[in-house]
Structure formats: C-alpha cells, structure tokens
C-alpha cells in the first residue's frame, strides 16, 4: 500500500500512514497533519468513535485477507478393518494427502490479499474523509456563531444604553411613553435574538462533542483561519488523483484485476499429493499417491468470466470517480470564488457606509426620532448580519473544497 500524502500546498494534508508488512498484512497508524484547524481537527481525528471502530474493522479485514495465503492443511486418515469370515487377517489403511493450491504456490492469492488490504485502507480513508469534512464544516459554523453572538451582544448593550437614556428622558419629561415602549421592545427583541443564537451555538457544540468522541471541544475562535484562501485551481487538480474517492476506485480496480489473475490460475487442474499404505499381516503395500481435478463442467470458465465482468465494472467506476471528482472540484471552486468575492464586496461597501455612530449622535441630539432611529438601525444591523452570513457561506464553500483533499 502506498503511503497516502497530499502536498502541503493543497489546503490540508491527509497525513502519513505508518506501514509494516508482515506476511502480507499491512498496519496503518491513523495519524494526520492539518494546515487548518490544526489542534481541533487532530483532536477529533484521535477521539472520534466512528474512526476508531473503522480502524479496528480495517485491522480485522487485513487479518481476514491474510487467512488464505497458506496451503490448506494436510489430511490424514487411518482405517482399521476387521477380517471376515473368521480367520481372515485384519487390514490397516493409512492415507496422508496434501492439496496443492496454485493460487498460493504462484503467489496470486497473496497479491489478491495485498490488493484487498489496499482496498480496506481506501474504505477507511473514505470514512475518515466524511468525518473530517463534517468536523471542518462544524468548526466553520462555530466561528460564525461566535461572531454572531458577539455581534448580538454588542447590539444588546447598545439597546440597553438607548433604553436607559429614554427612561431618564421619560422621567425628566423629555420623552413620551410610546417612545419608551419602542426602545424597550427593541431591547427585548435584541435579547431574544441573542438567546436564540446562543441556543443554536449550544446545539452545534453538541455536534462537535459527538465528533470528538463524547468529549467537549473548546472552540472560542471568532476569526476564520488565515490559511483559508483558495490556492490556484491547477494546484488542486494536481492533487485530485490522491483524493479518497479516486483512491478507493483505484484500489477496487487493483483488487478486481488480482481476482481475475487468481481465477485464471485456479482454472488449472488442482493436484493432490500424498502417501498411502495398506498393511496386512505378512503383506504390506505403501507408496506415493497423486490426484487431480478435471475441469469438465466449465465452473472455472464461469468464475473467470465473472471476475472479468467485475474488473470491467471497476474500470468504469474509476473513470466515473475521476470525472465526478473533477466536476465536483470545478463546481465547488467556482462557488467558493464567487461567494468569497461577494463577501469581500459586501464588507467593503459596509465599511464605507457605516452610520451607527452618526445615528447615535443624531438620536441623542434630538435630530432623529426614535422610530427613524430604530428603522435605520435595523437596516444597518440587517446589513451586518448579511455580511456575517456571506462570510460564513464563503468559508463553508472553501471547507467543501478542502474536504475533497482529506
């Protein structure tokens, strides 16, 4: 099995797998290196219960694949037969036989075992990719909710300040009850929105805890990683042959090819060698024996035909996997590029047209009514929320591109 390692220029690395071959068995240590969310992703990769179960299943499959790499056990038979009628001497027959498996003798069965090990590793990697992709997206969402909660906390503080200001004005006779009720309602709505965002963040924290094997995962970040900029599309395309989906299809083709070669070898007449002895009083007969199967009914031809059909299906699956990965990458890359541009454009416009300080001053100076202030403030807050969502969507799109490379 080739070591699976993606270039460091491709957002994230699959990592190096330690291999040791012993009688056709390959062991893999699921160690991984990341360039994004390094600490969190390594912790999840180490603690995730699904990956632990899949890794144990991988080792079980490797042991099972190596179980048929030796010749079948020899057979021994001893028969003691009494003479009849009375006076006939008893006879003892001894038979020892060994079946010769051409698949074992030619090494074809061992090669199939190694190919099956590679396929098992590829299956594990597909499961690994799915877990890491889910974790990556969940971490992006957690940053979004941290940013959203921080934004909503600022809005709540602003709403409370305005409410306190109007309570004072109301007590001084400078504001009426309608205006006071409006700012109180605005404060209640701000607090409710914050509590809803915190509830969503708590639910997402449970998802991260599940991915982390039941252990809570601290994720206080409010900024996205600086390494989430998309690399050139050509660089990503160079890494496509190493992705989990393509690797699994290639391993399946390798396994089916090895199965065809084994089926051809097993089509040869199967030999059995041994020793036979017949022992009677004063008369002993013994010597070597040999037997063979006669491929008369066409079972072997049907097995070879079936193996070839599986091989053709694997070839088509590999072509489909490569095309699918290529199409998926192009689609996700275009989507990520467009969403990044949209988020950046919105941020630029919002930074250039910020009116929050001016609105507060106008309200305090009495140049703006409470209703107009709340409407203008709501419009500005909607734009801020749209920016947070646009940045999140852009980061999720980059996360999907990154997930292809796990």
How does the language model describe each region?
Residues 1-7, 13-30, 38, 216, ...:
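Acidic, low-complexity, intrinsically disordered peripheral segments
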Residues 111-114, 177-186, 370-378:
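Short, charged, amphipathic alpha-helical segments
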Residues 13-75, 80, 100, 108, ...:
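Bacterial Sec-pathway N-terminal export signals of envelope proteins
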């Amino acid at each position: 099995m080739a070591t699976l390692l993606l270039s460091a220029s491709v957002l994230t690395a699959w990592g190096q797998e330690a291999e040791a071959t012993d009688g056709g068995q390959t062991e893999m240590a699921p160690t991984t290196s990341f360039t994004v969310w390094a600490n969190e992703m390594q912790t999840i990769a180490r603690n995730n219960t699904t990956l632990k179960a899949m890794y144990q299943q991988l080792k079980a499959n490797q042991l099972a694949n190596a179980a048929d790499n030796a010749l079948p056990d020899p057979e021994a038979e001893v028969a003691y037969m009494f003479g009849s009628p009375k006076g006939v001497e008893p006879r003892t027959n001894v038979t020892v036989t060994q079946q010769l498996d051409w698949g074992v003798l030619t090494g074809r069965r061992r090669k199939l075992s190694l190919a099956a090990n590679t396929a098992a590793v590829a299956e594990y990697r597909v499961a690994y990719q799915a877990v890491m992709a889910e974790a990556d997206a969940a971490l992006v969402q957690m940053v979004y909710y941290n940013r959203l909660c921080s934004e909503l906390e600022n809005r709540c503080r602003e709403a409370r300040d305005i409410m306190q200001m109007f309570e004072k004005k109301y007590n001084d006779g400078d504001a009426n009850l309608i205006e006071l009720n409006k700012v109180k309602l605005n404060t209640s709505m701000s607090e409710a929105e914050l509590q809803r965002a915190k509830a969503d963040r708590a639910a997402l924290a449970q998802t991260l805890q599940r991915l982390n094997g039941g252990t809570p995962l601290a994720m206080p970040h409010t900024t996205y990683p600086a390494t989430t900029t998309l690399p050139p599309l050509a660089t990503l395309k160079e890494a496509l042959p190493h992705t989990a989906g393509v690797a699994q299809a290639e391993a399946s083709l390798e396994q089916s090819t090895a199965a065809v070669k084994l089926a051809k070898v097993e089509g040869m007449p199967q030999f059995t060698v041994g020793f036979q002895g017949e022992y009677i009083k004063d008369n002993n007969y013994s010597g070597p024996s040999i037997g063979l199967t006669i491929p008369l009914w066409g079972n072997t031809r049907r097995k070879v035909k079936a193996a070839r059909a599986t091989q053709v299906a694997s070839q088509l699956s590999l072509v489909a996997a490569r095309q699918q990965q290529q199409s998926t990458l192009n689609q996700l890359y275009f989507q990520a590029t467009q969403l990044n541009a949209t988020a950046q454009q919105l941020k630029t416009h919002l930074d250039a047209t910020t009116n929050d300080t001016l609105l507060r001053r106008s309200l305090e100076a009495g140049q703006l009514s409470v209703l107009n202030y709340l409407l203008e403030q709501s419009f500005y807050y909607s734009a801020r929320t749209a920016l947070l969502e646009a940045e999140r969507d852009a980061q999720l799109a980059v996360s999907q591109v990154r997930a292809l490379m796990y």
